[in-house]
Amino acid sequence: MIENRRGLTIFSHTMLILGIAVILFPLYVAFVAATLDDRAVFETPMTLLPGTQLLENIKTIWVNGVGVNSAPFWLMMLNSFIMAFSITVGKITVSMLSAFAIVWFRFPLRNLFFWMIFITLMLPVEVRIFPTVEVIANLKMLNSYAGLTLPLMASATATFLFRQFFMTLPDELVEAARIDGASPMRFFRDIVLPLSKTNLAALFVITFIYGWNQYLWPLLIITDVNLGTAVAGIKGMIATGEGTTQWNQVMAAMLLTLIPPVVIVLAMQRAFVRGLVDSEK
């Protein structure tokens, strides 16, 4: 039992407040920069008081983008959403069916196949990414949604998590389904899926954020500005050489990019937390 000491309470709350301040201060600076005009954002030191140009900056990047040959930011956001949602649905579908087959079907070398999937976690991304790009290029899938999403739909981690959960389900459920004459897919649809809802919610949130925050993969696969994603697009807004970066518009784009993941987390936070807790049981 932890003693309720006043000094310990003050210390822990102080550290909590400091941690929150460290995390939120860069976001506040980005928000302030997004509200300033082109002149004020380059003042040294930059003011920490919000300006009045937030909506104007958002409107500019939303319709026109930033820089030369830049796509409208709404199109980048749409591409990011399509990519994140497709990866999420595909990853959950592939992982659930793979884990279901490994746990409930009896076929030769099924455990070997699982460990072959699992061992891919030991390979760094840098080792896997360039052979994957070569495959996508040979399949003529560069500059396409298929090239953006299909290679990221397989997940050893998600397959492992679903496998561990399925192994906790009692064998009596399988026997009851067999007695009722249920097919494997009916057993999956009517019994396994409802029992997996909390795990699905947790994995949906994690995978959506993973897909939304993809940076390196879109840079390697996409050269068409109209297929660019928001995260990679922000990097393209930063001028190189003698160009001048419109930091107020870049920060406005960053704030817009934060909205979808935050909405997903807030909308599914209860199911997300419950899924994480259930996965540890």
Swiss-Prot record:
<feature type="domain" description="ABC transmembrane type-1">
    <location>
        <begin position="77"/>
        <end position="268"/>
    </location>
</feature>
<feature type="transmembrane region" description="Helical">
    <location>
        <begin position="247"/>
        <end position="267"/>
    </location>
</feature>
<comment type="similarity">
    <text>Belongs to the binding-protein-dependent transport system permease family. UgpAE subfamily.</text>
</comment>
<dbReference type="InterPro" id="IPR035906">
    <property type="entry name" value="MetI-like_sf"/>
</dbReference>
<dbReference type="Pfam" id="PF00528">
    <property type="entry name" value="BPD_transp_1"/>
</dbReference>
<feature type="transmembrane region" description="Helical">
    <location>
        <begin position="202"/>
        <end position="222"/>
    </location>
</feature>
<keyword id="KW-0472">Membrane</keyword>
<dbReference type="GO" id="GO:0055085">
    <property type="term" value="P:transmembrane transport"/>
</dbReference>
<dbReference type="GO" id="GO:0005886">
    <property type="term" value="C:plasma membrane"/>
</dbReference>
<keyword id="KW-0813">Transport</keyword>
<comment type="function">
    <text>Part of the ABC transporter complex UgpBAEC involved in sn-glycerol-3-phosphate (G3P) import. Probably responsible for the translocation of the substrate across the membrane.</text>
</comment>
<keyword id="KW-1133">Transmembrane helix</keyword>
<feature type="transmembrane region" description="Helical">
    <location>
        <begin position="16"/>
        <end position="36"/>
    </location>
</feature>
<dbReference type="InterPro" id="IPR000515">
    <property type="entry name" value="MetI-like"/>
</dbReference>
<protein>
    <recommendedName>
        <fullName>sn-glycerol-3-phosphate transport system permease protein UgpE</fullName>
    </recommendedName>
</protein>
<keyword id="KW-0812">Transmembrane</keyword>
<keyword id="KW-0997">Cell inner membrane</keyword>
<feature type="transmembrane region" description="Helical">
    <location>
        <begin position="85"/>
        <end position="105"/>
    </location>
</feature>
<feature type="transmembrane region" description="Helical">
    <location>
        <begin position="113"/>
        <end position="133"/>
    </location>
</feature>
<feature type="transmembrane region" description="Helical">
    <location>
        <begin position="142"/>
        <end position="162"/>
    </location>
</feature>
<keyword id="KW-1003">Cell membrane</keyword>
<comment type="subunit">
    <text>The complex is composed of two ATP-binding proteins (UgpC), two transmembrane proteins (UgpA and UgpE) and a solute-binding protein (UgpB).</text>
</comment>
